[in-house]
């Protein structure tokens, strides 16, 4: 009996998690419980491309500051895009939204020019979307 209750409980929990993820996945922006806005650029900037294709991001914003920028799966060269993740993405952490809107002014990662340019365009688009829709 306990095993059945546990199995049903786990199934309900899993179904709830999958449903919640599916709802958020289709949205460009959603608000987390702690007040952080998350802007997903997958559908926002489908034509912004790095060297090998789109470079979607999730940009986390709280109190008009970028908390962090996370790269989503893409087709860029892992070795070069790792450089972007290590060098460029952390530069946005703690940056005010007004400054992040001018992301093209941020220095990119050496050797990953196209990827850097695409990431900066994605950040600027995410911040603009946040400012318009928060």
What are these regions (language model features)?
Residues 11-13:
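Repetitive helical segments and hydrophobic/amphipathic motifs
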Residues 5-7, 17-117, 121-134:
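Flexible, solvent-exposed loop/hinge segments and secondary-structure transition points
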């Amino acid at each position: 009996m306990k095993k059945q209750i546990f199995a049903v409980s786990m199934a309900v929990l899993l179904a709830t998690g999958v449903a919640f993820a599916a709802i958020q996945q289709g949205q460009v922006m959603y608000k987390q419980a702690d007040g952080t806005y998350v802007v997903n650029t997958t559908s926002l900037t489908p034509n912004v491309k790095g060297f090998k294709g789109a470079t979607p991001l999730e940009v986390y914003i709280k109190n008009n500051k970028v908390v962090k920028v996370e790269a989503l799966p893409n087709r860029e060269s892992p070795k070069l895009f790792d450089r972007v993740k290590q060098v460029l993405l952390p530069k946005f952490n703690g940056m005010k939204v007004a400054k992040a809107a001018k992301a093209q002014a941020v220095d990119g990662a050496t050797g990953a020019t196209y990827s850097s340019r695409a990431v900066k365009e994605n950040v600027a688009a995410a911040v603009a979307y946040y400012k318009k829709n928060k």
